[in-house]
Amino acid sequence: ELISEHALPRLMRADAGTVIRWLRSLPAAWLDRRPELHLTLAWALVARFELQLAEEAVCAAERALGAGAGPEAGGNLAILRGLLTLAAGRTGEAIELYERALERLPEGADFLRGLLFLELGTAHLIADDLPAAERFFAQSRTANERAGSTFRVLVSEWHLAEIRIAQGRLHEAADLARQSLRRAEEGGRNSPGAAMAHGVLAEIEREWNDLPAAVELAGRAWQLGKHGEIANGLLVGSFTMARVLQSLGDFPGALAALDRAEEIMNRAGQPRFVEVIHALRAGIQLDQGHSEGDAEALEAAARWAQGSGLLDGWREALAGGRFPGVHRRELTFLVVARILLARGDTGAARALLADLLALAERSGRVHSQVEVLILESLARKAQGDTAGALAALRGALTLAEPGGFVRTFLDAGPEIAGMIRQAISASGLSPDYARRLAEAFGTDAAMPEEAAVAMPAAAPSQDLPEPLTEREVEVLRLIATGLSNADAGRRLFIAPSTVKKHLENIYAKLGTRNRTQAIARARAAGLL
């Protein structure tokens, strides 16, 4: 009786681990006498992405209930069956199950209605119908507020924020995430429900090129997700940390973060998601190989590409159901396009990019359009079409300006840096956005790039036992924009090993151990 009374409130506060331990401590016969506890266990397992075990709990509930399931238990079963169907990749079938369950719900069943709206939003998001997904997530937030399920309100707001990011509405997404944080922290600063909001803010700060802030937020998302044993928080923290560390040039750290995500998805029995993680790993290895001259990393990326069959079979895979949801397919195929470009197969790369751009335009995913147009610009440049390359880059800049995108351009590498000045000056961007982009690239949109590199900024005042040299300040500023050692060396016309030596001196003078700490310490000291 005590567990039955407290399990659901615990679950609504995102404490899945405690609920699972409670229910697994009971004899199976006791759960059979209270079939609703089988359902509560299933929901707790879903929260941890332990979907195979969740299905076992659903089957146990169905056996215990027989034909005597009332409206509430029947509604729970229908939603869980839809969720497991969705996880198996049968999106259309899952939507039909959810809609039938919604029709059968009694009046006032806000808890179940909130669950259904949340799952309908997820299904439409996977189907790449962003307007429908946004509508259902908004309804989920309202119904879950009425039901008192704060955690599911936060999940709904997380999805709404992610949709805004996809649509290029980064400022609105940040406002919504901060609102979610305030709501979550009403339940205590260490509320697991805050994990996803921290992850959203980490993603946005990364895009706005505040990498130290992004590292801190992504780490917080992971810690809170781990504290509550909430898989969404762990995944958001892992994926975002991987992207931030990739931008910082910490490739081993980025790969380790992806390893954590893969462990979660393997436990969930989700091989299609794992395949996406493998693609993201290949993208990191590609960056590592180009940035550090690491032949082994390049070979690893090439092995993934060959083994996946996507270099030649991308068209069939893009149209089929091999990957879970259009957006996740796109993450994979952006890596494929980059590998095709690296191999010099620009024709195939441009054909793939044209299909990806059409998908992104159809659903209004501005962020994706920006990423595709940047790669299109690189492909056209490789073909010698300078005018076409600049036109594609200007298109990306125009789409990116309202959200203030910066990092997506920086991460495209030095080839984009060579075109950015011309593209900025010809794109009609606002002076503020043009200035922020120019500063991020270490150039001035109003002057030749060579002159911008040659003109150091005024040296800041330093209150350090041993002040940084002018060259060390230059290195620190470039590293703070997220450039790798190799890219910073190219800007300063010095070897990557020399950049590394300067960084070692900087760490010693600032009393730090890595670039993230050094950037944070330098900001606090007014050096940046």
Where are these regions (language model features)?
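Alpha-helical solenoid repeat scaffolds used for protein-protein interaction
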Residues: 237, 246, 257-271, 275-418
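Amphipathic alpha-helical segments of tetratricopeptide repeats
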Residues: 7-8, 20-28, 59-69, 99-109, ...
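Tandem amphipathic alpha-helical repeat scaffolds
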Residues: 4-9, 36-50, 73-90, 112-129, ...
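Helix-turn-helix DNA-binding segment
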Residues: 452-510, 517-528
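Hydrophobic, well-ordered secondary-structure elements that form the walls
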Residues: 282, 337, 372, 377, ...
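Intrinsically disordered or compositionally simple regulatory linkers and C-terminal tails
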Residues: 303, 307, 311-321, 419, ...
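Flexible inter-repeat linkers and adjacent short helices
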Residues: 1-98, 102-111, 117, 291-294, ...
